[in-house]
Amino acid sequence: MAEEEPKKVTETVSEPTPTPEVPVEKPAAAADVAPQEKPVAPPPVLPSPAPAEEKQEDSKAIVPVVPKEVEEEKKEGSVNRDAVLARVETEKRMSLIKAWEEAEKCKVENKAEKKLSSIGSWENNKKAAVEAELKKMEEQLEKKKAEYVEQMKNKIAQIHKEAEEKRAMIEAKRGEEILKAEELAAKYRATGTAPKKLFGCM
């Protein structure tokens, strides 16, 4: 069992490691550990350090280049992220400002519409009141006009009546004077005397 274990160890160590120093030191440690532990445990333990060292050596060679790129990418990523966050904040702020502006405009429009509506109703009420007053005045004027027309008609009738009375008086007086003239003429004929006044009409 002990012979088989070192063989396995040497085989596994010789394959992955190119340098002779590493396999020489490791088998001794493996030989010390092997009798104490189970035979299955050593093989996975021994090959793992060699690749780790290779990886460390490889990483040591690559370390100066990779971190710079990563740092640059991180810087660029952080700058881009900051720019994106700033743009998002700006867009958010602009959208809030736009929403506020729209709300204020809507509020102003509603307020103006309300005032315009109240002015329109006020105008209509005032116009209706004035038109009602005008109609009332027209009715009063029509009533007064009818009264005045009636009064004028009465006056005209009175004037006509007075004129007729005057005409009748004149006609009566004329008839009386004609009778008087006829009587005097008959008297003058009977007496044979001439009238003192001739051509009284002239």
From Swiss-Prot:
Stated induction or repression of this protein's expression: Induced by mannitol and NaCl.
Keywords: Coiled coil
Disulfide linkage: none
Any one annotated GO CC term: plastid
Compositionally skewed regions (Low complexity) per UniProt: 25-39
Stretches with biased composition (Basic and acidic residues): 1-10, 68-79
Biological processes annotated in GO: response to mannitol; response to salt stress
Name used for this protein in its record: Remorin 1.4
